[in-house]
């Protein structure tokens, strides 16, 4: 029982954001309450969750969206609660998505372990998970109340006597309500953001031209795609995951149907139009969409090994240098692992390329001996290995994983048809490779690259990578490399894109495109694709321009009232990274401490009452949008769960 009158005063904690990460904090808080000594004294807790959308699914995973929007991870991957994650005691309400969908097959639409669920299905999981967590919290003696507020937080300020006061505006438009708390957790998720200067010019030009429409970066489920007219020419900029969601809405969402053809991967689908589709013209810097993921049974293929980027090798680098530089320390080791996994798989599955099984094994032995010889950088290793490959397979080029990610870097095309044929060939082969899974040398090379990316994420979060390397390496070239190769959609999304092209409803504009507005509407050109008459770059015009991307995850670009207030009043500050010249560059996220990620104010002081979780940690973490992985380490692949555990512990330390 409480020991004093002061100890009886309830502690008030506010979760600003009721999506998956807000749920994580309260699941971790529940687990810690369930593991406490029942005889220990405590202060009652008054818990508040504020979100304009339903708690659990929040905005992104809300349960009223189209079933055509897919997750980018298979069922076995995500969790919003500690589910067999080492070092974390699960609460009585804990359940991973895979555990939930096995006992709720109808609500899960029958999705299987290796399939990619609809986002609405994940929202159903989050809804039920929150129901269990909130029910368990309300039954705890320590919890005096748990209140959900369907509202938006528009400001957060400090009270002179300690704690914070938040201003809430309800979803019905009524504002002015305040909420006082001893501590707050900012689990904000995706936020609205300002357009860039270029985007703003295009939006303004569209507003001045009757019949032109500009759709800026947005969560696809927040857009009414029905406003795009049938037959309209739509320029779609970006060929990542949002683009595939948009294609689904503009085709299947309008009554079109994909049929299986029985043909090989890459030609597995035929599209039957409804007659209500627009014509879609896609463009991106690289000129190709994200490639399909390998069809494997784990997030990193089981057969991938990091022989060179090993724990021992990295620890030796840290002992010698104190910190890591991706280009100088990590990439030479990871590049060797990429090469080794590629050719080891080729020897196992395609030995005839290297002269048969005996010759292939001999080649691999010589290659491994070459790779084992330390001291080479990636270019030297590649040159020596290419000389070795020429002795066994003179007609083969040595693996250039960077060229795979940007295949048209040095190419030009005489006509759009030439370019389209190259894209189709590349995507059809990518579908074949995805189907081969662990038997594909290419997919195993990508798997090694992906495994290295996961290691880098952990080292960045642990402060083991220099700021300058994050700027000049991770952001500049490594992130685009791994995103394009290993963060793509399931193969069926690429099959659908190819089927739409064969149906005459989709084409690609070309690499490094530019967009302007003229009398014909929006006009896009690629300097690498000529027109049919040799008169310069081919151009495509349209009445719609759609930015197929999420609003940028940069707090400095945030346009929500809360984000602006926090930064303008100095309650929060933008994090910084020191470049190679010693200049401070703005980071994507807030300035925070290490775990439990307390917010720092503009004057550098640490705010003991405000914690940050999720996307706005992008200044100290990399890849903050991805979910926690079920069964994985909370210091690594389940990092957001580890962050939530630390925040819950810091909150309860006050009780």
Predicted regions, residues:
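Flavin (primarily FAD) cofactor-binding/catalytic cores of flavoenzymes
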Residues: 1-63, 108-654
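Redox-cofactor-proximal catalytic regions of oxidoreductases
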Residues: 50-108
